[in-house]
Swiss-Prot record:
<comment type="function">
    <text>One of two assembly initiator proteins, it binds directly to the 5'-end of the 23S rRNA, where it nucleates assembly of the 50S subunit.</text>
</comment>
<dbReference type="InterPro" id="IPR005824">
    <property type="entry name" value="KOW"/>
</dbReference>
<dbReference type="InterPro" id="IPR041988">
    <property type="entry name" value="Ribosomal_uL24_KOW"/>
</dbReference>
<keyword id="KW-0687">Ribonucleoprotein</keyword>
<comment type="function">
    <text>One of the proteins that surrounds the polypeptide exit tunnel on the outside of the subunit.</text>
</comment>
<keyword id="KW-0689">Ribosomal protein</keyword>
<dbReference type="InterPro" id="IPR008991">
    <property type="entry name" value="Translation_prot_SH3-like_sf"/>
</dbReference>
<dbReference type="GO" id="GO:0005840">
    <property type="term" value="C:ribosome"/>
</dbReference>
<protein>
    <recommendedName>
        <fullName>Large ribosomal subunit protein uL24</fullName>
    </recommendedName>
</protein>
<dbReference type="InterPro" id="IPR014722">
    <property type="entry name" value="Rib_uL2_dom2"/>
</dbReference>
<comment type="similarity">
    <text>Belongs to the universal ribosomal protein uL24 family.</text>
</comment>
<dbReference type="GO" id="GO:1990904">
    <property type="term" value="C:ribonucleoprotein complex"/>
</dbReference>
<dbReference type="Pfam" id="PF17136">
    <property type="entry name" value="ribosomal_L24"/>
</dbReference>
<comment type="subunit">
    <text>Part of the 50S ribosomal subunit.</text>
</comment>
<dbReference type="Pfam" id="PF00467">
    <property type="entry name" value="KOW"/>
</dbReference>
<dbReference type="GO" id="GO:0019843">
    <property type="term" value="F:rRNA binding"/>
</dbReference>
<keyword id="KW-0699">rRNA-binding</keyword>
Amino acid sequence: MLGKKLHVKKNDTVVVIAGKDKAKTGKVLQILPKKDGILVEGVNITKRHTKPRGSESGSIVEKEAVIHVSNVMIYCSKCDKAVRTRTNTLEDGKKVRVCVKCGEAFDK
């Protein structure tokens, strides 16, 4: 079963608008539509403690954890802030996401 369509895509630059990492920006690494979640580079870092296995020693690994998609907004480089998006249809029928404030296209 497919998940929902989310307002962000992989490699988008987003701003966190809620939670402990509020106001941080980062690139979307992975989309998880079934959980309504995303992984953002450098945001919501958690520590994973691993036990020693064979020749490997135990360690503490830091990695990104999933955050809910409603806690992020797309970053517009032209407006220099987090913005809402609108979908516009081009003359050739292709749909693109654009900034509501300035009209900058995010899908090229």
